[in-house]
Amino acid sequence: MSTNSPSQKGKLKAVVISSAQELNVDVDLRRLHEACSSLGDYIAPFMKRVRLELQRVKDGEQADVPMVPLFIHSPIPYGEIKILFLDVLSGYPFLRVIQLHRCSIGDDGILTIAEFIRSYKPSPDRNPFGIQCFEVPECLIGHAGAKHIAKLLSENETITRCVLDFNPLGDAGAQAIANAVRWNGTLEDLSLQYCGIGSSGAEALAEGVLRCSNVRVFSLRGNPIGPEGIKPIGMALSIGGRINAIDVAGTSFGGSYQAVETFCQGVESSVSLTAVDMDYNLLVPEAASLIASVISRNKRLVQFCVNERMEAQQFLMIQNALEQNGKGSKKRKKKKRSKA
């Protein structure tokens, strides 16, 4: 019988069980990979990511839950959209990001995906976040599909980023989205680039997004909203207090001094805005001095992109004003750190 005390014996190494091991992540990844094997070639890149993640879990390199986004960048046959979302993915508990780029899913396809997101409720110990990022650029979604997305957003409490770029939503689709986001408390980043939105759609978005929602980053780049569309956006900026960055590049309003003035007045009055992009708008000559003075008066502005096709002296005037704001911003940060 050994007389050695426990302290004299070699200490046993503590066994550390990772989150991945505790939750049997490898089982879920293997099931997902097997289920995807019955689908078309479009799913191959995603399957490769899943297989690599599974190997990392087996090798002990992945100790946490998997973060594999559903990223597909080619057309999905309509017949397989329901299989993918309602059969294959419904049982996978770790999905947080859906990125479908140029997938040609159309209005009927987006209805199926909206139903999936609405019903996707994984257990909190595995995925307390749910679907947080939803990107469907260039997917042939029209105003009917926009209404399906709008209904989802009006009910959803998990999505923080929504990208609908290069879809023909039109004014009707924009109005549906605008009415929905005012009831959504979690969406922070909304992108509607090149969606064929005109002045009436812009007016609805000014009210729903800029005045009544929690959206902090908003893009209307490439939409023909024109002078009449930018005016309500400018007025909404002066009232809303959430927006941090707005992109209205290439929206065809720069030729109207009155429109530029109204927009700039809103930018100047904003208590939250730090970044503005109005590039690809040919500006009237008087606009440069107006923009520079707005930047000088609103010290929060540290980014302000404009079309470089103007007099060099005018462009430098704007850049100098931004540089001064940038220096001031750094000083304010240093003061906060010293107080802390």
Predicted segment positions?
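Leucine-rich tandem repeat or coiled-coil scaffolds
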Residues: 1-340
